[in-house]
Regions:
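Membrane-embedded transmembrane alpha-helical bundles that form the catalytic cores
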Residues: 1-208
Length: 208
């Protein structure tokens, strides 16, 4: 049994450690500030991953929630809740699960629609949680970066990777792939670095 949100806690703790090591941020002198950063609750269930260099400077600023932040926060919470509770859960219970539980009872077209339905379910579930987290953070006076950018509009796998779970893909790129050497040492090393990055990223995601 693992605590809820342990993967995002791990990502954020590593982000702080690496950013300090790279001298991109100064070490925190307050244990309370560090505890606040790693335990800030809106995103701990399903993201987005919040980097130390993006969040910690906000701790040091006076708390302020503008009318625009409040309105956008409420909108994102309602939109995220609609995605999760209405679209994702409805598709899952009334369509996807029925087909996946007994695929032989349905035609090929219906099974194909089940796959498309599952893709929509996963997107609405995950992005719904992210939208709610971003909205709650805004109501508390903090800004999170966009985590999903219409990924199913992508024209290629590369573009999809840049649009889906942006905080995770950029974290893996900046803290793993580039640290391993990226594409600077020939094709073999590039492909090896990609494989290692995807493997370790998958392991870290599994502990969520």
């Amino acid at each position: 049994f693992l605590p809820v949100g342990i993967s995002f806690f791990t990502f954020q703790s590593l982000s702080y450690t690496i950013d300090v090591y790279r001298e991109e941020i100064k070490p925190l002198t307050s244990l309370l500030d560090y505890a606040f950063y790693v335990s800030f609750f809106p995103q701990l269930v399903a993201g987005p991953i919040v980097r130390a260099r993006d969040f910690i400077p906000q701790i040091r600023k006076p708390l302020y929630v503008s009318q625009e932040m409040f309105g956008r926060g409420i909108f994102l919470i309602v939109a995220g809740l609609f995605k999760k509770a209405v679209i994702s859960d409805y598709i899952s219970i009334n369509f996807v699960e029925r087909i996946f539980d007994n695929p032989t009872l349905y035609s090929g077209v219906e099974n194909l629609m089940g796959l498309y339905g599952y893709a929509l379910q996963i997107y609405c579930d995950f992005s719904g949680y992210s939208d709610m987290a971003i909205g709650i953070a805004l109501l508390l006076g903090f800004h999170f970066n966009l985590n999903f950018n219409s990924p199913y509009k992508s024209a290629s796998i590369t573009e999809f990777w840049r649009r889906w779970h942006i905080s995770l893909s950029s974290w893996l790129r900046d803290y793993l792939y580039i640290s391993l050497g990226g594409n600077r040492h020939g094709k073999f090393r590039q492909y090896l670095n990609l494989i290692i990055t995807m493997f370790l990223g998958g392991l870290l995601s599994l502990i969520h």
